[in-house]
Amino acid sequence: VFALVFSAVAACSGPRDHAQILMPRLSVPWSESVRILGDSVPGKTFYSDFLMIRDKMTPARWHAVGIHKSMNTLYHAVADSLFGEWKLQPDIVSTDSVVRMWAPFAIWSPRGDSAYMYYHHGLGPDGGDMWNSMRVLAAAGPDLDRWTKYDVYAEQEAAPGVRNIVFTGPVPRDACIFFDESLDKYIMYYADDAPRAIQARTSDDAVHWSEPVPVMGIPDPQEAFVTPESPFVIRRDGLYYLFVSGFDYARVALYVSEDPFDFGDPIANKVGEINGHAPEIVKENGHYYIACAHIASEPGMAPGAADLWGTYLQELVWSPATEAESAKIFRKDRK
């Protein structure tokens, strides 16, 4: 999930005509997009939830880090441009015996000389405990080539044995973080299982986080997803766009809100859906791009199934909202 500050172009001051509000759309079907990692043959290679972040030593160079193999290591790939040749580097390996090293996300530190990588990690000898952790690594330098465990408790004499645990909870996973200039805070969005919801936390330093608040629950009846997954939030023109995956790997639900901590009702305020799974959204030269991995190209496949293996990338285009879409945006004055 990409570490970029998405700032508002214009403040959202009261209701706007739907034609003034932009909605994200896929530019092509995923089968016509560019596969940047993995093999198209089902089962040959496994790539799933991942992050993308741009290098500060070589500004055109991009890094991707994500789930593969047995899911207790993270792959690392680099490319000289978004649509260039992605080359695999040595894995970022967990030194623990615990399985389930999931869904990384990286964001540059406030000083800009390093980056923090958040990931879900199981607790217990086999990672099977219900209670799990959100952990953090730090880049050894601005080239992002080497990552080490970050000591969250460096200033405390008494600290947990595993010092890179940021917080624990019932399967906290799939973090997405950005700096919200309007709040002067970092916001982390992530999926959780108790409650089954998308949660949000805030931070001044991108390391120490507030208590969580739920920003989006699951539908009841469970039409769109059973367990929320892979939230991704961007802020554009004073609005917050929440992309959230779920049980069906073919669908990503879209919600739009004026409030970063409340996206309304999961059914009534669902603006729409796009095809895909575990989206990562990046911005380069004024254009937005969306990447997804392990995609079901058509809704209705078995849970967790996909027919497009690997990681795919395409431009995310924006067009005026329809009147029906605009009506589902969550407004602060409608609380």
Please report, for each region that a protein language model flagged, where it lies by residue.
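Carbohydrate-active catalytic/glycan-binding domains of CAZyme proteins
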Residues: C12-K335
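Bacterial N-terminal signal peptides
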Residues: V1-V9
